[in-house]
Amino acid sequence: MRITILAFTLLVTACTSQIIGTDEHIESYIGSNIADAQKLYLTPHSQAVSFWESRTFAWVETQTPLENGETQHAFKNPYRDCTINWVADQNGMIIAGSHSGEMCSP
């Protein structure tokens, strides 16, 4: 019985440790080209809605030019309250990122 509980605990810990948070995800893209983020967010993918149902969708991008020549790229999830914001310089390199919304955490 103890071995079963230990094995189950190890399995759960191993699986949950693979999930990165939204902040870590954003940090990992700083220094990348905005085209990499666009490819990730604008490519349709399937997400589970319930045990029996899933939806295929892509995030919606809004670009806002900033006064200093940089561009803010906001990627909105159409089904959840989550927006990922990237600021890219004139060369398309991501220099900053943030998120907003109640459902951005994994």
Where are the regions that the model predicts?
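Sec-dependent signal peptide recognition
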Residues: 1-8
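Residues within mature, well-folded domains
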Residues: 16-106
